[in-house]
From Swiss-Prot:
NCBIfam families: YwbE family protein. InterPro entries: DUF2196. Pfam families: DUF2196 (PF09962). This is Uncharacterized protein YwbE.
Amino acid sequence: MNGQERNSISKGLQVDIVLKADQKTGKLTRGTVKDILTKSNFHPHGIKVRLEDGRIGRDQQIVST
């Protein structure tokens, strides 16, 4: 599942995100969603989320539901 639609993401899901610093390389960081930061229902580069550890990035893939 990709992370472009807000309704497919919820708190507690395990996701792979791309941090701002890793946008050029596309390196993925895995974590658990704490907050959903994007207000719109869709974003072509992924919904922006905050992980439990405080890191912020755009969701690229949902690992678990």
